[in-house]
Amino acid sequence: MEDDSLYLGGEWQFNHFSKLTSSRPDAAFAEIQRTSLPEKSPLSCETRVDLCDDLAPVARQLAPREKLPLSSRRPAAVGAGLQNMGNTCYVNASLQCLTYTPPLANYMLSREHSQTCHRHKGCMLCTMQAHITRALHNPGHVIQPSQALAAGFHRGKQEDAHEFLMFTVDAMKKACLPGHKQVDHHSKDTTLIHQIFGGYWRSQIKCLHCHGISDTFDPYLDIALDIQAAQSVQQALEQLVKPEELNGENAYHCGVCLQRAPASKTLTLHTSAKVLILVLKRFSDVTGNKIAKNVQYPECLDMQPYMSQQNTGPLVYVLYAVLVHAGWSCHNGHYFSYVKAQEGQWYKMDDAEVTASSITSVLSQQAYVLFYIQKSEWERHSESVSRGREPRALGAEDTDRRATQGELKRDHPCLQAPELDEHLVERATQESTLDHWKFLQEQNKTKPEFNVRKVEGTLPPDVLVIHQSKYKCGMKNHHPEQQSSLLKLSSTTPTHQESMNTGTLASLRGRARRSKGKNKHSKRALLVCQ
C-alpha cells in the first residue's frame, strides 16, 4: 500500500506533470473568426442542437463518440473513502467528484485505454483508471490515493481544489494524445475528455454600423461564474450571457466596414457538454479571501436559455456532485464533497468518512464547484443499473444474489455463468433428493429411532440441543438469504448417526468435567438434524 500512497519514504514524491492554470471562458485556446461558416463539420458533438455545424473541419478523430461505453459498468453503491495524507483534502474531494462522473467512470472501468496504452507509467488516464477501479470496488474501505495523481502539483500544503481538478482533467486530456503530437486544435477537441467535459463558447460581435457579424469559438472544460452580484447559479449564468455594448474607447474595429464603430458582444454556449463543471468564483485573485455567501443552485438546471440556438426544447442537467470549501480563505480551511451514487443516494465524502446524506443537505452548502450531467445521460445509466448490468465489487457470490442467471450470462461473461448455473442446479438437485429420501424413510417407520429423550440422556449436561425442522416447512417464514444460509448449513451438518459416535460423546464428557469449575453455568449448543 505504501507504493501507492502520496507520501513515501518521509518525503513527498512528485515530478510527472507541470502545474496547470485553471481555465476561464475568455481563454482563447482556439479562434475561428469568420462571417461565413462551413456547411458541415465532422467534429463529433451532441446532435441535441446541431452544435457543431459551424466549427472548422477536423483533421483527425481521436476518440469517436461511438467508442464511449453505452451501458453502465459502475457498482450501484457508494465506494471507498480516501485517506488524508497531510493537507490533501483538496485532492480527495476532487477525486471523489471525478470518480462519480458516470461517463468517465464507465470508460475507466471498461479498461479500454490501458489495453492500448504503451506508457502506463506517467499516464494520467492509466493512473485515474486504477484509482477509480479501486475506489468503486472497495465499498466500506479506506484507500490511499496514488502518489502519481498529485505528482507535480502537491507541495505539502493545501492547494486550490478547482485548480487541482482542472490540472487532472487537462492531464487526462493530454494522455489521449501520445501518438498524435502534431494535431490541430480541433482534432484535440475530439478526445475522450473533451467529449465528456468539453464544449464551445461562441463570442459573437455585431457591428451596429454595417451589421457585420464576427463569431469566435473557444473550447471550454469548465465554466467560471461571478457570484458577487448573483444570488443563484441561474442569475450568474444570465449575467454571463448578457450582451455587452462596445463603444467609445472600447469601440469595435469592424473587419467588414473597416472602421471603428459601436458594436454589441454576446457570449453564449454554442455546444453543450455532456458533463458541466460550474465553478463559483469564491476567492479573490489578489488576496485569496473568500466570498462566504449562500448562492442557490438547483437539483435540475435548464441550460437552454444560455445556448446560442434558442429554437429547441429544454436542455436539462441534473446535479450529481458538489465540491465544498469550509473556511475563510483559499490558503486554509477544509475541502469535502457530496456525490450521488448510481443507486440515487447522496453521500458526504469527507476524506476517510463516507456518510449518507440527503438532497436537502446537499443543496444547503456553500458550494465551490458544481457538477451537472445531462438528464438523458443520467437516466440511461440509471436504467442499466436497474437491469443489473453493473459488476459487483464483492465478487460473483454477491452478484448471483442480485441478478438472474440469464442476466449473468448476457451481461457478465467474466463471471462464468454456465459453470455457475450447473453448480447451482446440481446443488438444488441434491437438496431436493435428500429431503425426498428422508420423507420416504420417515413414512416407512412405525416409530422413530431417534428421539429427544435418548439424545438428552447421553449428552453432557452443558449441551443445549436445538432441533432443526425436519422437512424445512418452516423455511417459508424466513427471508431468502436466511433460507440460503440454512440450506448451506444443512448440507454441511453431519447426520445424527455421525453426531452420536461413542468416541465423540466420551470426548465431550471429558472436556465438560475439565471445564466444570470455570464455566459452571455455560451451555454449548448442538444442532441436531432429523
Swiss-Prot record:
Residues 382-412, 476-530 are annotated as: Disordered. It catalyses: Thiol-dependent hydrolysis of ester, thioester, amide, peptide and isopeptide bonds formed by the C-terminal Gly of ubiquitin (a 76-residue protein attached to proteins as an intracellular targeting signal). Its EC number is 3.4.19.12. Residues 80-375 form the USP domain. It is found in: Nucleus; Endoplasmic reticulum. One of its GO terms (biological process) is regulation of protein stability. The keyword Acetylation does not apply. It comes from the Eukaryota. Keywords: Endoplasmic reticulum, Hydrolase, Nucleus, Protease, Thiol protease, Ubl conjugation pathway. The active site is at residues 89, 334. Residues 496-505 have a biased composition (Polar residues). Residues 510-524 have a biased composition (Basic residues). It is an enzyme of class 3 (hydrolase). GO terms for cellular component: cytosol; endoplasmic reticulum; nucleus. GO terms for molecular function: cysteine-type deubiquitinase activity. InterPro entries: HABP4_PAIRBP1-bd, Papain-like_cys_pep_sf, Peptidase_C19, Peptidase_C19_UCH, USP_CS, USP_dom. Residues 484-495 have a biased composition (Low complexity). Belongs to the peptidase C19 family. USP17 subfamily. Deubiquitinating enzyme that removes conjugated ubiquitin from specific proteins to regulate different cellular processes that may include cell proliferation, progression through the cell cycle, apoptosis, cell migration, and the cellular response to viral infection. PANTHER family: INACTIVE UBIQUITIN CARBOXYL-TERMINAL HYDROLASE 17-LIKE PROTEIN 4-RELATED (PTHR24006:SF651), UBIQUITIN CARBOXYL-TERMINAL HYDROLASE (PTHR24006). This is Ubiquitin carboxyl-terminal hydrolase 17-like protein 22.
